[in-house]
């Protein structure tokens, strides 16, 4: 996975995990899973509800938070310029 993808995914998933935000995860086959993000890595998301499920990221279509989440994707300018 590219580094740019991680710059969006990691802060978003981390905010959902830290704030215990309920989420709906839609899979590419249309199945809807609900719960809270327990953990994640480059390939999987652990989703906790009554049980913990390991969901492979390649099977995920959409993640919908149950409420608004603030997460930072700010990165320093590549050329060191802060304009």
From Swiss-Prot:
PROSITE patterns: SM. InterPro entries: Hfq (IPR005001), LSM_dom_sf (IPR010920), Sm (IPR047575). The keyword Zinc-finger does not apply. GO terms for molecular function: RNA binding. The keyword Lipid biosynthesis does not apply. Homohexamer. HAMAP family: Hfq. Belongs to the Hfq family. PANTHER family: RNA-BINDING PROTEIN HFQ (PTHR34772:SF1). This is RNA-binding protein Hfq. It comes from Acidovorax ebreus (strain TPSY) (Diaphorobacter sp. (strain TPSY)). The gene is hfq.
